[in-house]
Amino acid sequence: DASPVYAPMTGAVPLEDDTPRLVVAMAGRAVHVYDLRALRHAIYSGAPESAFAPAQRRESSLKFMLRDVRCMPDGTGYATSSVEGRIAVEFFDTSAAAQAQKYAFKCHRREVDGVDVVYPIHAMAFHPLYGTFASAGGDAHCALWDPVAKKRIRQYVLPSPLSAACFNATGEVLALASGAVNLEDANHDGPDAGEVGGIGAGGHGHVKLHIKPALEDAKPKAKAR
């Protein structure tokens, strides 16, 4: 059954928002949100430059450089990821009730020789039917998350760092790219070549595409009664 089962946040947060938006991650942890309808009107009406300003200017909840930003399929918000192995889930509605629903969490970390190693989250992708999302990291892991339950649904372990992720339009498959992003120590030959923690080297000759089934893997888990 491929029917949507995504249940957005409850309370005063809108259940759906059909405003066409463009969300841009800027330098300095800034996030600009544009209303595409307003931009279209400004273009065709010959409006002054001030009309092309973002509808919202925000500061990211994450403390370090952003790596990716993705909008929720129901239009109510977006998620950002950072080089510090954290993800933030935020909402366009500026009311206090809606903003109280935003949150951030850490992921894509593991202990290596007694040290907590943090990996960047290079890419994310929202499932078009369920509203769950995937995060692809430099630790060669892809995690599937339920943003409502705030839990991980599933995790894949790939051979080398992940650089891109995308669900197809029907949500049947998840495509992952590995090997294109790697730390500097992966750029040399020898037995020690590879990512921190023994992850396989990226770079030329290691780029691969991985196709994962998504209709069942990305479906939110039913709540226990």
Language-model regions, residue ranges each:
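WD40-repeat beta-propeller superdomains and closely related acidic/aromatic-rich repeat-like regions
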Residues: D1-R225
